[in-house]
């Protein structure tokens, strides 16, 4: 079931979790649309990142939940860049890591002439040697550059799939390169993919404010120093929110709170670095 459907231009996500099984996230059907995805967790099993548009995902984790999982199923027709995953991690549970049964695949071409490129990917679980699968179309480009295993070793990609065949009567046949060059990889940048003619810059919204200084506790009163450009503060105990405030203090609840964390929030709602106080 869908966890996210993002159908507009200029969509950005930072530090979000998207969890489902099949079809977790459907991206825009408009191939001029831009999505920027940073520090996110995307989880699923079958075609769980699919659709069109130009999507740049950086420092994200693609988490696979079954053997034979398939990550992307794009349907780009006229996209300039397609799906671009930079400095991401591919991970999964024990079933997904069982390559002897059905290995995880990077993707398959749903419709049209889809594009997907994985650059500087860390693969914490084994990927099927062929890497990709057939579906309904021939990819314009399904490729990798500098894929590495969990230990940082460069993976050999000579067995990656380059020949594709569609489905049905008179099924199309074609090829796609499985590896791009260092020079090509260097063009798949934030500056080339995201700003466009309107100079959209979602990274500004995601900039982390520094951790509050002077964090201290007096009984149930927690205090800290002001952080420049902060619109508010959030107090955590582990993953649990203890409270939110616009000031530089918070009265703690009566139940014991052992380890406390405080972060500033910028004008766009992005969380800053955390100050930590252990009792």
Predicted segments with their positions:
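Sequence-level preference for short, compositionally simple segments enriched
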Residues: 1-221, 225-279
